[in-house]
Design a protein with these regions (language model features):
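Structural motif
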Residues: 1-8
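Flexible loop/turn connectors
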Residues: 8-101
Length: 101
């Protein structure tokens, strides 16, 4: 997907991927196109997984408490199964700034 975006040449200066693995894939496509991360295109992932910490350059990523996410998902699912009103929740997240943004 990143390679196709770069082929269009529409002046992309940043990418926010839906997870860290996709962000690392975007970084590879950016480098294959002869561009540099973060000098030419900044990249941010989502998960703050081990992938983000070991990527080179180290990946900036959004960290979310997966335990809290799992608990909230289970509570909402149980409420829905019981026929109770399901109220959306907003969970806290944190931007972990590293070398790619």
């Amino acid at each position: 997907a990143m390679a196709r975006l770069l082929e269009k040449g529409e002046g992309i200066d940043g990418v926010f991927a839906s997870n860290d693995l996709m962000a690392v894939g975007a970084m590879a496509a950016i480098e294959e196109a002869g561009l540099r991360v973060p000098e030419d295109i900044k990249v941010i992932g989502f998960d703050d997984s081990v992938v983000a910490q070991t990527a080179r350059p180290a990946l900036t990523s959004v960290r979310q408490d997966i335990v809290a996410l799992g608990e909230a998902a289970a509570e909402l699912m149980i409420a829905q199964l019981r026929g109770e009103e399901v109220v959306p929740r907003i969970l806290k997240s944190e931007l972990v700034i590293r070398e790619t943004a």
